[in-house]
Amino acid sequence: RSTLFPYTTLFRSALAELMDMARDSLETKRKVLEQLTDSDISLYPYTKFYLRDIKKRFNEYWKNHFSTIGLIGTNEAALNLLGVDIGTEKGKAFAEKTLDFMRDRLVEYQKETGNNYNLEATPAEGTTYRLAQIDKASFPDRAHFANGLGAAVKHPFYTNSSHLPVNYTDDLFELMDLQDNLQTKYTGGTVIHFFLGERMDDPQTLKKLVKTICENYKLPYFTFTPSFSICTNHGYIVGEHPECPNCGEATEVYSRVVGFLRPVAQWNNGKQAEFDMREHYDDAAEHQ
């Protein structure tokens, strides 16, 4: 989150320090969780039963579970440090080096602790907004956000993990060309969401598009996320309709906040600002 230091020196040092803090926290949590599971009055009785064979083998219930470290705002870090986004050659190289550095450090953590670690594109629905607010207060004149620069941004937020901004392009193939290599660097969960204004009615079109993506790209997970609305009187409505087209009553508009479908009105202010920026890929999808 630094806006001052070159990547090759203090930025990497600061990143390593934050990762070490995360490791220490995760190791403490793992020990506490193990104690709570192993106690005579276990707080996790069903999990204790389910993991009983792991306990017999390793003398630990949670030995096969991963400690996860993620990141947010890679695109904005590149803007702050280099003056370019990660859609550029220079910015993309920065993102790749950052992820490689984190992967290598996680391998060292595994060797040091004997526990599994992975690098994940964590959902971070709240963190992308909360940390942006902190940086807005700390660096009001120069902090880059996914939706603008500095104190003028009403509800700042950061992009998730190493994603491009949701309004970067309306061409899903351009998006995949720029993101494919980054997506494969995660050792935990990661996903690209293709936001659609409404559902795709032709299953054959969707089938063809999925086949094209799987045959030409390496990214591990992707979703097609249409928006829809729910009216208390008329039920499911295709697309984004704040008011029911049939009766005029207010509806609940649903979309994927990051990992789950939730009413947009229940999202935090940062995520609502992101929703308003989202490009839809309906045209690209339908022309397959």
What do the predicted segments below correspond to?
Residues T3-L10:
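Short, small-residue-biased leader/transition segments that mark boundaries at the very start
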